[in-house]
């Protein structure tokens, strides 16, 4: 099975949520209580080695958690992520307050609470924060 197919399948929840959101408007954490908490057993905060990928047509996607490392990374890269048109997944988040903290770190970016386990398996990924583009992984 191709890497693209392995990544595309777990993004179904994310795509449904994204399609129902207003453009450029982050989801209100209280409307997402039904999916919280989010846990990603295959992922943890840590260093990600850059790697080349071939996922033509994929919209840039980043994975973050509620940890300090993720929040600092998100704050540092928010402008670049916005320029890329990247969407975010909060792959480790306890509650609406933690989700709101993540979203407020990068106003203007859509960040959804979705487990990253299937993406981690498909891309052989162990850590976040990470940016996934059509051409590679980077931190």
What do the predicted segments below correspond to?
Residues 2-4, 14-61, 65-109, 117, ...:
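Non-globular targeting/processing and membrane-anchoring segments
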Residues 106-114, 119-124, 130:
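Helix-rich interaction surfaces within compact, conserved domain-sized segments
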Residues 129-138:
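A short, hydrophobic beta-strand/beta-hairpin element that forms part of a small beta-sheet core
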């Amino acid at each position: 099975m191709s890497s693209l197919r392995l990544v595309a399948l777990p993004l179904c929840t994310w795509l449904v949520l994204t399609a129902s959101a207003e453009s450029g408007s982050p989801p209100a954490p209280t409307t997402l209580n039904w999916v919280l908490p989010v846990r990603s057993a295959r992922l943890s905060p840590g260093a990600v080695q850059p790697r080349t990928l071939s996922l033509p047509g994929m919209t840039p996607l980043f994975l973050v958690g509620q940890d300090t490392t993720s929040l600092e990374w998100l704050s540092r890269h928010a402008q670049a992520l916005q320029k890329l048109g990247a969407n975010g997944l909060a792959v480790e988040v306890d509650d609406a307050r933690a989700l709101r903290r993540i979203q407020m770190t990068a106003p203007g970016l859509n960040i959804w609470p979705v487990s990253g386990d299937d993406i981690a398996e498909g891309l052989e990924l162990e850590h976040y924060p990470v940016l996934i583009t059509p051409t590679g992984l980077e931190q």
